[in-house]
Amino acid sequence: MGSLGAILKHPEDFYPLLKLKFAARHAEKQIPPEPHWAFCYSMLHKVSRSFGLVIQQLGPQLRDAVCIFYLVLRALDTVEDDTSIPTEVKVPILMAFHRHIYDKDWHFSCGTKEYKVLMDEFHHVSNAFLELGSGYQEAIEDITMRMGAGMAKFICKEVETINDYDEYCHYVAGLVGLGLSKLFHASGAEDLATDSLSNSMGLFLQKTNIIRDYLEDINEIPKSRMFWPRQIWSKYVDKLEDLKYEENSAKAVQCLNDMVTDALVHAEDCLKYMSDLRGPAIFRFCAIPQIMAIGTLALCFNNTQVFRGVVKMRRGLTAKVIDQTKTMSDVYGAFFDFSCLLKSKVDNNDPNATKTLSRLEAIQKTCKESGTLSKRKSYIIESESGHNSALIAIIFIILAILYAYLSSNLLLNKQ
């Protein structure tokens, strides 16, 4: 759960965090008994705890298909991300990955920590994949083939232009959006969304991750991963790694704001995609990550910390998003609130200020025209810095009760 300091600063986070804690425990108890499915769902919770929770929104058949789709693509991504694999070995694996998923004996040792376990024990994923319906299998195979080919292309090619950047993000994330739309359609729950809108859903998430993960990617050993397009960063520095040096802070922030402004172009498409969804479970599955993305962009914007360490939404706010996202009015409210926060951080002297403000105003206009903003729940109102002692005492009492309850349950489970 969130740290005590964070809870005292944001006491409104406590209840959503508590619900998230119990939801996580419930999700862990839902792991199927069959060894290959048990491996897949356990691995899902390890490689992405938040996705492991969000996927629980879906019905059983679709949940299984999305779980396997996610693990197959995480495995593919693990091969791409491992900079120690020689190009002549990596490219053929990426190109043939869509065939390997049919092979119960195939595995390839690479990656670290839980990703290495995923790759070493990949036969469990293949076994589970082969139990899916043919419609799900075909969709997963098609997207895996196209993504592997795209990744292979960019192993041998740098991201030079914004068009390159959009193309790379299409291969590694836009195709995920297309694949999920196909899975939703195959389940009979949704109409097939257009490729353009599906692509934007993936690009908005991927560009947010690329912006947030700048420092981790540039410091990757033995070789940096460089996804920011030269067409953007070359306006500010001579080399991409120069952005992390303190003497370049002013230029680095301008470059960062340029990248965020580029990502915002996809927000309106995302709102359109989500507004077309019919099923509440699929809606929540899609909406929660998109709200997290615009929230993360709001935190990153104009923030030098992106070049010094990790920038991410506090756990309590994440819990709040998961708890409160139920309808499209919640999404419009969240996008409106976070775009207001972004707008408040725009420096009029920033070279992209006019473009940034224009994109934010377009997002706000779409949210206002929905006619639902009066119903919105606030995501960004900061708590007062000081809270009275009675409130703090109540929180400590609740925490003590919760700790005692969880401890007693743990002892009972061990007996």
Swiss-Prot record:
CDD domains named in the record: Trans_IPPS_HH (cd00683)
Subcellular location(s) of the protein: Endoplasmic reticulum membrane
Transmembrane domains' residue ranges: 281-301, 391-411
Pathway the protein contributes to: Terpene metabolism; lanosterol biosynthesis; lanosterol from farnesyl diphosphate: step 1/3
Listed InterPro entries: Isoprenoid_synthase_dom_sf (IPR008949), Squ/phyt_synthse (IPR002060), Squal_synth-like (IPR006449), Squalene/phytoene_synthase_CS (IPR019845), Trans_IPPS_euk-type (IPR044844), Trans_IPPS_HH (IPR033904)
Catalytic activity line of the entry: 2 (2E,6E)-farnesyl diphosphate + NADH + H(+) = squalene + 2 diphosphate + NAD(+); 2 (2E,6E)-farnesyl diphosphate + NADPH + H(+) = squalene + 2 diphosphate + NADP(+)
One cellular-component annotation, GO: endoplasmic reticulum membrane
Upregulating conditions: Induced by jasmonic acid (JA) and methyl jasmonate (MeJA) in adventitious roots. Induced by chitosan (CHN). Accumulates upon Cle-mediated signaling, an elicitor derived from fungal cell walls of C.lagenarium, thus inducing the accumulation of saponins. Triggered by ethylene (ACC), rose bengal (RB), nitric oxide (NO). Accumulates in response to hydrogen peroxide (H(2)O(2)). Induced by N,N'-dicyclohexylcarbodiimide (DCCD) in a nitric oxide (NO) dependent manner thus leading to increased ginsenosides accumulation.
Keywords assigned by UniProt, alphabetized: Endoplasmic reticulum, Isoprene biosynthesis, Magnesium, Membrane, Multifunctional enzyme, NADP, Transferase, Transmembrane, Transmembrane helix
EC numbers on record: 2.5.1.21
Expression sites by tissue: Mostly expressed in the shoot apex (buds) and roots, and, to a lower extent, in stems, leaves, flowers and seeds.
Topology versus the membrane: Multi-pass membrane protein
Pfam families associated with the record: SQS_PSY
Highest taxon above the source species: Eukaryota
GO biological process, one term: response to salicylic acid
Gene Ontology molecular function: any one: squalene synthase [NAD(P)H] activity
Function (record text): Component of the triterpene saponins (e.g. ginsenosides or panaxosides) and phytosterols biosynthetic pathways. Catalyzes the biosynthesis of squalene.
UniProt similarity note: Belongs to the phytoene/squalene synthase family.
Protein name: Squalene synthase 1
Organism name: Panax ginseng
